[in-house]
Amino acid sequence: MLSKFGEKFTLGFQKLMPDAFVFAILLTLAAVMGAYFIMDRSPLAIINSWYDGFFDLLAFGMQIVLIIITGYSIALSNTVKMGIDRLTRFINTPIQVYFFVVCIGVLLSLISFGFIVITCFLARELAMRIKGINYPFLIACVYFSFNSWVLGLSSTIPLLLNTSDNYLIENGVLDQVIPTAYTLGSTLNMAMIGLLVFVAPVLMVLLRPKTPSKSLEELLTTTDENNTTTIQAEAQALKLPFNAVSDRLNNGLFLQAIIVIMGLVYIGMHFYNKGLDLDLNIMIFIFLILGMLLHKTPMRYVIAMKRASTNVSGVLFQYPFYAGIMGIMLYSGLGQKMADVLAAVATIETYPFYAYITGGLINFAIPSAGGEFAVVGPSIIEAVKALGAGLPAAEVNGMIAKASLSVAYGESLSNMMQPFFLLLVMPIMAAGTTLKARDIMGYLVLPVLVFFVVQVLMILVLPI
């Protein structure tokens, strides 16, 4: 019964949801209308705000492109493919694949949100080998597993609160840092981790479609060169018909080995000096060095990177439009206004709920946890401080931590209903197919509704 609802929601999304780029345009126009009618900004001022923000995500967009293609290139190596072949000895039915992909995706995203690319190529390779998998639903499983990143080591808001001299302290919103013991190490966050690790895989298995499968093999519209021509064969075909120094350089081990050794030395130094400090830059570097190590020669790695980068156009040109929306929300004051309205109606009992709703709603216009919290965080924290007036400082800090976590949880769950971060998944999962975000999102409606109810109850009932 529930799986039938998932199919109906999917059909509805296919009929109503436009391409991800059109969705970004519609969000832009919605932000423009809000700034004009609510904030009484002039059209020229709104356009200036849009342009001022338009290029704010260039660095982040480039990081996302690199995390996708360096991660995907690792999956194209013989070593990884042989490892996945061995894995299919133990995981060989669609139900096992759905369960395993959600479980491993949740665990990897707890380490870093960039590790979703590993989940993507693992899921795709399993789908190529195991019959009966509904591939659009498998993509939904991968994306849903991404929810756990806000609970883990790369969660932006808790790390910000624990950073000395952060902008909240500099602007007098906070007078001290909020330790991660109040956020990532809290009872509430540990319970949320348990929800994702133990409940999410079971939930997605229960909601799996019962209709005839749409396998990856059926959905492929172009020949997958990754499976028809090996990287080694292509590298060999590019050699000149006579002995040449250039071919020896292109296909030799020595040059690449030097770079790999240098990279491994730095990676070792990084973790020795900084512990388990995983930001996007070091992850990209690790993926790059590991890819070079697995592919062995410069030419093989060039071919792998070329194959991995064929489907990243969505990230390249859509992220600036989302940055433009962020600019309108930030520079027109619209995001601040929305946060103020929601914070004003909160009480000592309901403030986590309103923080959660704020995080979820504003995320549609500012789909970046750090960028969103820069807009809504000060208003929410000031409201919580007012509600906690007269209480011990430790208790107020706990309230601030709970409100901040609630924003993060709401932001993460609402990601499932908009395609911004799905742009990380589709270049790998949808390569060679005509699949769009609208083919995936319907399968996420029921899981999102279930998690919305459960998460709201948890943030209202559980202590920090």
Question: Where would I find each of the regions flagged by the language model?
Answer:
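Membrane-core helix-loop-helix motifs of multi-pass transport proteins
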Residues: 122-216, 399-403, 423-458
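Long, contiguous bundles of hydrophobic transmembrane helices that form the permeation core
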Residues: 2-11, 167-300, 429-439
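Alpha-helical transmembrane segments and their helix-start/interface "positive-inside/aromatic belt" motifs
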Residues: 9-25, 56, 96, 129-144, ...
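Early transmembrane hairpin of solute transport permeases
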Residues: 57, 63-167, 365
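Alpha-helical transmembrane segments of multi-pass membrane proteins
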Residues: 94-108, 119, 132-154, 160, ...
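Hydrophobic alpha-helical transmembrane segments of multi-pass integral membrane proteins
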Residues: 90-125, 316-331, 343-387
